[in-house]
Amino acid sequence: MIAQSPPKQGASGAPGVYACGIHMFAETPMRTQVAIIGAGPSGLLLGQLLHKAGIDNIILERQSGEYVLGRIRAGVLEQISMDLLKAAGADQRAVAEGLPHDGIELLFKGQRHRIDLHGLSGGKRVTVYGQTEVTRDLMEARAAAGLTTIYEAKDVALHGFDGASPSVTYVKDGQTHTLQCDFIAGCDGYHGVSRKSVPESAVTEYEKVYPFGWLGILADVPPVSHELIYANTERGFALCSQRSATRSRYYVQCSLDEKAEDWSDEAFWNELRLRLDPEAAENLITGPSLEKSIAPLRSFVAEPMRFGRLFLAGDAAHIVPPTGAKGLNLAASDVGYLWSALREYYGERSNAGIDHYSEKCLRRVWKAERFSWWFTSLMHKFPETGAFGQKIQEAELDYLVRSQAASTSLAENYVGLPADW
């Protein structure tokens, strides 16, 4: 392993943000076993898991630590994700402060119907805990372990991953640096450099863009329900979610040509009420928004997920619409497969894990893509839906809540399929 400096804090005090010491590597390349591109939750989780396994790693992130922590994302964790956080030594706060959920509610035709996730899935549940908090916990764990994260690394470029000696170059404080490594893990998201570094002829991309978005609002108000409410209405989809007992996250389906700034808080709350059942509408507590944004919805998969000594993980390889709460969980399962493969490589000198990484990931990815597409198609109003389509959706929802077989299928997928399926 390479010697590493103790963690330093930048002027902001964000954990793991290095403000000095980088210039010393300007002429002599750094060396690590695994170079991780991206310090979001998937990159940080992989870094912690590798560290626990005695595998050296350095993370490069093009944004600042503050920017990474400022991203508002999903907040529903499957048990597999919780187990990986535990293995990484970063689950203490998620266990203490996360909200275990044993069910969800489906709202259609003005009435709510509960799906017993726990009872239908053989005792599994999900945990509501914001991605921002997951990221914060992993950043703090990495800093406490003295591991190297280089934030604001510009012009990151990947080299030689189709051979035996890959490397990564980047610019920091105006100087170009080289990081030599055994493997590169691309955890830098849909717009990151990792997937774009692969020749177009070597990758096949599948994509579906949905004709609507989600207008989301974050507010420090108690949730309207202790479990999530998914609403199908003639006005469009709505979701009542939460981050804690005092912070709520709400969404309404909107058109792609709308802008968040055109929606006042009052207009949002009024529209949400119109999409809820009378009891929920009456109990809804409103307040000023902490954050308001519109997110487009898409399904996307890039195949394969391994290119020589480069591995893609998380949003770098696949995107799901947020309806099924699968994005962060898929990223975590990718990381789990890669962690296992690299432990096998370094511990047993076996290529079996890395050779089957892409196949294992994609088998799980496509099942989650199918579920997310199905749930999105069922709950949203499409331009072509019309009165007939609305009736079909309502009939399917009615079947779903009355049929134990159908409810079980929903529950199994929502809480997360087994890792070996």
Describe the predicted segments one by one.
Residues 140, 147, 151-157, 161-297, ...:
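Conserved FAD-binding catalytic core of PHBH/FMO-like flavoproteins
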Residues 8, 17-30, 325, 340-421:
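C-terminal helical "tail/cap" subdomain of flavin- and related membrane-associated enzymes
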Residues 67, 188-189, 320:
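Glycine-rich, N-terminal phosphate-binding loop of Rossmann-like dinucleotide-binding domains
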Residues 70-74, 78-145, 159-162:
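Active-site-adjacent segment of FAD-dependent monooxygenases/related oxidoreductases
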Residues 37-52, 138, 293-374:
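Conserved mid-domain beta->alpha element of the FAD-binding
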Residues 34-36, 57:
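Conserved hydrophobic helix-helix packing surfaces used for dimerization/oligomerization
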Residues 51-72:
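Glycine-rich FAD pyrophosphate-binding loop
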